[in-house]
Regions:
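Short, basic/aromatic recognition patches that contact phosphate-bearing ligands
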Residues: 1-71
Length: 71
């Protein structure tokens, strides 16, 4: 499996499970820079916006200082 695809699936699963996605932590975990994680976040957001039956949104939560999934 492509590293990027595996990383996006892993990030997706983490946010679906209720985890707060902090870019710096994710970048360190996967050995990439924060820009790569931001692109992954954008891909996950695009997935949710292209699914007409999904009311989910991945958005930044200032209080939690990371990205969370809103239903």
């Amino acid at each position: 499996m492509d590293k990027k695809v595996g990383r996006i699936i892993s990030l997706y699963n983490r946010v679906v499970d209720g985890e707060v996605l902090v870019k710096a932590d994710a970048a360190a975990r996967y050995g990439v820079n924060e820009k790569s994680i931001q692109r992954d976040i954008n891909d996950i957001r695009a997935y949710f916006s292209n699914d007409p039956e999904s009311n989910r949104e991945l958005a930044y939560d200032r209080r939690k200082k990371g990205y969370v999934l809103f239903n």
